[in-house]
Amino acid sequence: MNTTEILNAIKAEVAILETEHAKTSKAARGRARSAANSIKKLAADFKKTSTTEDKA
């Protein structure tokens, strides 16, 4: 994955987070937390990939 693909994945997860956060059920809150964790992992991947691309 390159940084553009990772950024698009982060944007998709943010959209899910916003949608699920607006809901009131426990399941929706769980999905929101899951999306937040995915964003965290993607951000780490973005930093690694960005550094690699800068070196190339």
Regions found by a protein language model. Give the residues of each.
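Short, charge-rich amphipathic interface segments used for partner binding and complex assembly
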Residues: 26-55
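Short intrinsically disordered terminal tails
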Residues: 1, 55-56
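N-terminal acidic leader/helix
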Residues: 1-22
